[in-house]
Regions:
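C-terminal catalytic domain of Rieske-type non-heme iron oxygenases
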Residues: 79-80, 85, 91, 151, ...
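Generic structural signal for secondary-structure transition and capping sites
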Residues: 47-51, 98, 215
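N-terminal short leaders/motifs
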Residues: 8-36, 98-114, 146-154, 228-264
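Generic alpha-helix structural propensity
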Residues: 33-37, 49, 71, 88, ...
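Short Pro/Gly-enriched beta-strand edge/turn motifs at strand-loop
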Residues: 49-60, 129-133, 279-284
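Rieske [2Fe-2S] iron-sulfur-binding domain
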Residues: 59-163, 167-177
Length: 408
């Protein structure tokens, strides 16, 4: 039975400008949110060369302190050495490939593989091999833990599995470095432990929703009560930015009204930022929400084509004032409700994208962040322009990027 022609090409909106991307006004096809081969290419071309946040330098203050990040079948340890330097390694023993560290964080003078007892120091060097004589002329210096690139961006530690020539985190955030300076990232401390929240959706849906300003007034009544309709969105080459100012009009909701009341002045912030909520999203999957009272970091990591893991942790400047403690608790209550609303929305989208009836959807000119993200994905994986899924095995013939930095 022949399928009906795709109605989307006949829609009059949007009309591309001369020399513009003909797909600029359209979403990614539905099949890209559920296809295993597409995820495999995303893993190689997007996630392996992208920066991923692990922790803050204050989370590993002493020699031997470490944090672990697991994603796309890799496990990375960020660790402070006895010399005070921060390094990152693959969490894989060089003997038989066993994972070494199970804890999400901790402190250890040595890392010992639980399989055969190979031991590494805090700089990743191989220092102990049981029954070493049996390995002949084993070069200990050549069998340390595999290093992983690490970048310290104003106190936050990012890792990158592969360098494809793309920019540093500092370069990506350069347009906003003066804006965030007042928040004193280097002095932040964690308010709690890392939280992991599994979601039965494709990872892109979480990011699409995060940068979507149009749904705020429809699906988040609490944010509308707090900010009215004054929610801004912009997209730059590597970063999306969203923002809204807390209104003076008391909310009808108790937690929101209490937050408006108790939120104290932050002496380190200029007047225009005392009531401003700002959100940044770095390509491809990292976000940080900047509030006057705290800063929340979040990333969404793919598990399968229809499963993702949200990893998040809040940070703040030390402040013992009762009003600030109350504001931070109320912030959590407000955003817990927002997260519940978003969870329902993204699961609704994933369910809809499972239908063969959906190919692509038109994007408003106001959806600047989503337009930009879709364009980046199409640049990295050209098959994302296809309205229908290619035949099985299509990814094996996908043209390589020929050394082009996908993050440039």
């Amino acid at each position: 039975m022949e399928r009906e022609p795709d109605p989307c090409p006949s829609l009059p909106y949007p009309a591309p400008e001369p020399d513009a991307d003909p797909d600029a006004g359209w979403s990614l096809p539905g099949w890209t949110y559920r296809d295993p081969e597409f995820l495999a290419l995303e893993t190689r071309r997007i996630f392996r060369p992208s920066w991923q946040v692990v922790c803050h330098v204050s989370d590993i203050p002493a020699p031997g302190d470490f944090h672990r990040l697991d994603y796309i079948s890799e496990s990375v340890i960020v660790m402070r050495g006895e010399d005070g330097m921060v390094r990152a390694f693959a969490n894989v023993c060089r003997h038989r490939g066993a994972r070494i560290v199970d804890q999400p964080s901790g402190c250890a003078k040595r890392l010992t593989c639980p399989y055969h007892g190979w031991t590494y120091d805090s700089a990743g060097r191989l220092t102990g091999v049981p029954r070493r004589a049996g390995y002949g002329a084993l070069d200990m210096g050549a069998h340390g833990l595999a290093p992983v690139e690490v970048e310290d961006f104003h106190g936050f530690l990012f890792v990158r599995l592969e360098n494809d020539g793309g920019p540093s985190v500092a370069h990506m955030m350069a347009p906003y470095v003066e804006e965030i300076a007042a928040y004193r990232f280097e002095q932040l401390r964690a308010l709690g432990r890392v939280t992991l929240r599994p979601r039965t959706v494709n990872w892109k849906i979480i990011g699409d929703n995060y940068s979507d300003g149009l749904h705020i007034t429809v699906a988040h009544p609490g944010l509308r009560r707090l900010m009215g309709d004054g929610y801004g969105v912009e997209a730059s080459q590597h970063v999306d930015k969203m923002w809204g100012t807390i209104t003076d009009r008391p909310s009808s909701h108790l937690s929101e009204r209490a937050y408006q009341h108790f939120l104290p002045q932050a002496p380190h912030l200029p007047p225009e930022r005392q009531r401003l909520w700002t959100y940044f999203k770095l390509w491809p999957n990292i976000a940080f929400d900047i509030y006057p009272d705290q800063i929340d970091f979040m990333q969404w990591l793919p598990i399968s084509p229809t499963q993702a893991l949200i990893r998040e942790v809040p940070y703040a400047l030390p402040d013992a004032r009762r009003e600030m403690k109350a504001a931070r608790y109320l912030n959590w209550r407000i955003n817990r409700q927002v997260n519940a609303e978003d969870s329902a929305l993204i699961e609704r989208v994933q369910a809809g994208l499972a239908s063969e009836s959906f190919s692509v959807g038109p994007l408003s000119e106001e959806e600047v962040a989503l337009r930009h993200f879709c364009g980046r994905v199409r640049e990295v994986i050209p098959e994302a322009r296809l309205r229908e899924r290619p035949d099985l095995g299509w990814s094996h013939s996908s043209p390589p990027l020929q050394g082009r930095g996908l993050s440039r």
